[in-house]
Each structure stands twice: as structure tokens, then as C-alpha cells.
Amino acid sequence: IKVRPAANIIHDAIVTGNLRSGQTVIEATSGNFGIALGLLSKLELNVIALVSRKLQEGVFEELRNVNIRTMDLDMDICPAPGMEGKQDLLVAKASAANIRSQLSNLGFDTDIFDKASSEIESLLASQDIINLAKFLAKIYGFFCPEQYDSQLNIDAHRTVTAAEIDQQLHEKGDSLEGYSIFCTFGTGGTSGGLSRYMSEKYGKKSVYVIFPPTNQDVAGIRTKANADGLT
């Protein structure tokens, strides 16, 4: 399902000149968006995915299979910036050293990293991996799709995903109009896009978000507390 927003965001970036040939793409992902970028193989994208070591091994294998280079972090990807799960400075410094080492192994200039180490450690201290990806893109000249903030993410699910589901139901003599839709919340793109489609086409509010319990760690899925202000 992530191929839809990935294609939409990358297409827009190419058309607008925000993504140039040979430019590295970096994004924070629970795995699926990174895999989706890898599936756009004809574009020959050079992609680095910031991922959590908490992911299942199968996800890492899939990322490798589509030639995505990963930077593994000992923290969640989806917690809302600056909310729960703050780390102390020593842990942040250790995480920064880990990222620096991985950037070096990937062939990038660590002097650039060193000059921005205080900002990077601050982002790591608050587990703000989403904005860390943006910051690394800024200092290294990478392109960050910013899937968590992009209206193009929601638009892709509104114009493509929802329309596909509705079309498949129409082929069976049915329609989305008569259904309630239940989904989880990671970037908010799927739930947001489906909700807008239902509202615009059928004048209904029939999309419901299911959150895991607060103490349950599900890679890429927000708890209700970590989605406050985003839903």
C-alpha cells in the first residue's frame, strides 16, 4: 500500500526539481515505505532508510532485497516528537556515535556530521527520528520524502487507494458507501486519505482508527497518546 504515496511523492519531487539524478533519498520508516521506495527500481533511487532494530528480521531482509541501505537505531520510529520515551544525554551520544559510524560505512563525510553533532544529539534525546531524517537531509544535501508530513501521502490514498477499493467493490455490485473502514495509524496517510474520500464522495464519516494498548510496542504503529494532535 505504501507504493502509492511513495510514487506520488517521488514523482512530485522529480517534476518540481526537488529530487535530482544521483541524489540520495533518506527517510525514517518502519519498513514499508522504504520497501516501497525500493520497488520503484526503474528510477534507480539511492535510498537510506532510518529504521528501528525492533523490526522483525523479515523486514530487514525485504529492505535488502530491494537494495535499500539501512541505518539501524535502538529506538522507535513513530513516537510523536518530544513526547514520551525521552532518553538521557549519554544514550543520545551513544546513538549519535552509532549513526556517525554507519554514515562513515556508507561512504559519507563524517566532518559534516561532527559539525552538527549537538543538533543531532538533541533530536536523538527526544527520539525525534522523523525530524532527524529531515535534518540529515538538510546537512548532507539528501532528499527527504517527509512521508509523515506530506499532503501527497494523504492525497495518494484519497485518489488511488480508496478509489481502487471502491472500484473493486463496484465490480462485485457493491460500494464503499455501505461500509465502515477500520485501520491503524502510522503516518496517518491511509486513514486520512480514506476518510477524505468517504467524506467527499459519500458525505460520510465512517473511518475508524484502531490503536494498540499504550504499553504495546508495534513497529510503525502509533498508540493513541502518540497520535494526539495528529488525528
Residue positions per predicted region:
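PLP-dependent amino-acid enzyme catalytic core
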Residues: I1-T231
